[in-house]
């Protein structure tokens, strides 16, 4: 099956998918998240990634630079391969067009050699995982890696600030699982299996959960998890719905709230930026993408970045646990490092920062492990 433009009804992460007797899944690889969307599928003999660029005239024309596009595609996908490899790679299109670019053909040869070397060393092994991370939304595992994805790795103004989180995680040294609100209802102790929970997206969407945050069982489970030492990272408008005087239902964990008009007459004083472990590699400028306006910090929070009195990054403590708020985080090497630090801080694991670590955030270190550390 080619997992591409149309695959409704063939949800590859549902348990029923493994019963249909499919031999293999092939899909277009636009970035790390799309690679994991393919490589994490279970119950097939092999998975294959169709790398970019396709041999089509939009790239293979006079003055075009298919080699550059191929390099960006490979470097982006490679970090995800090191976490969970596909079994085969390939390219597609009109071969006649590719033959007109000998540099491109030479580069593809080098990619194939590198892939074989990586595959021989990592297939069947367990990658080093510094912490266990859960992405909480309405779909859970059914849309693993495909949430915030409309078309393979295509930019959309409305969601690139959130898709960057999933992209960063696709090649990061974490054991990543996707869970739903129903999973928590059915298994109240489920969160004990994780170190950090993320909720990412806009309000009143399946990404963040909408009215699920009115459910006492959900609120109790998440608050108990954090209070006992877990971490919660909210991106965009996390845990949000207007209810009982709050918009962010976990404002007490995140330390921030969104002004929706009900607290305009409440003075807000917490606007000072502070240095922090999370931003040590970030420099003065952080790319929050579209970001968010009208987010203000509660007195207990520590603001790390604000723009025009709109909080973009803040941290807070809740019992023995910690909360982190991020307004948005498009994928980049720098932002991938920021998210890595944010997860470690949320998990109270700053001391593990230098395990398999590069001080240059443009370089990522991948290691193999037989157990989670």
Q: Each PLM stretch: what is its role?
A:
Residues 154-249:
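Helical hinge/lid and interdomain linker segments adjacent to catalytic or ligand-binding clefts
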């Amino acid at each position: 099956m080619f997992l591409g433009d149309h695959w409704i009804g063939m949800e590859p992460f549902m348990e029923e998918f493994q019963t249909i007797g499919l031999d293999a899944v092939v899909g277009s690889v636009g970035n790390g998240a799309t690679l994991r969307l393919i490589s994490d599928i279970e119950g097939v003999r092999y998975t294959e990634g169709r790398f970019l660029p396709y041999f089509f005239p939009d790239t293979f024309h006079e003055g075009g630079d298919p080699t550059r596009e191929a390099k960006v595609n490979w470097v982006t996908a490679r970090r995800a391969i090191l976490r969970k490899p596909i079994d085969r790679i390939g390219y597609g299109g009109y071969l006649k067009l590719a033959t007109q670019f000998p540099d491109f053909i030479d580069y593809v040869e080098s990619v194939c050699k590198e892939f074989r070397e990586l595959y021989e060393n990592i297939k069947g092994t367990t990658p080093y995982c510094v912490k266990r991370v859960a992405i909480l939304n309405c779909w859970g595992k059914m849309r693993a890696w495909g949430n915030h994805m409309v078309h393979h790795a295509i930019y959309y103004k409305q969601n690139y600030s959130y898709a960057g989180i999933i992209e960063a995680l696709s090649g990061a040294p974490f054991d990543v699982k996707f869970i739903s609100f129903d999973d928590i209802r059915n298994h109240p102790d489920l969160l004990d299996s994780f170190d950090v929970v993320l909720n990412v997206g806009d309000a009143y969407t399946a990404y963040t959960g909408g009215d699920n945050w009115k459910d006492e069982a959900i609120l109790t489970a998440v608050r108990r998890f954090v209070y006992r030492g877990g971490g919660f990272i909210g991106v965009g408008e996390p845990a949000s719905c207007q209810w009982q005087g709050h918009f962010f239902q976990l404002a007490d964990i995140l330390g921030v709230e969104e002004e929706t008009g009900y607290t305009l007459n409440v003075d807000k004083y917490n606007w000072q930026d502070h240095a922090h472990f999370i931003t040590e590699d970030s420099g003065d400028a952080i790319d929050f993408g579209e970001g968010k306006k009208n987010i203000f910090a509660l007195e207990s929070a520590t603001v790390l970045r604000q723009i025009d009195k709109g909080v973009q990054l803040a941290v807070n403590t809740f019992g023995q646990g910690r909360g982190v708020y991020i307004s948005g985080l498009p994928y980049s090497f720098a932002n991938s490092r920021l998210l890595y630090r944010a997860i470690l801080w949320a998990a109270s694991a700053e001391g593990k920062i230098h395990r398999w670590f590069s001080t240059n955030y443009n370089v990522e270190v991948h290691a193999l492990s037989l157990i989670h550390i």
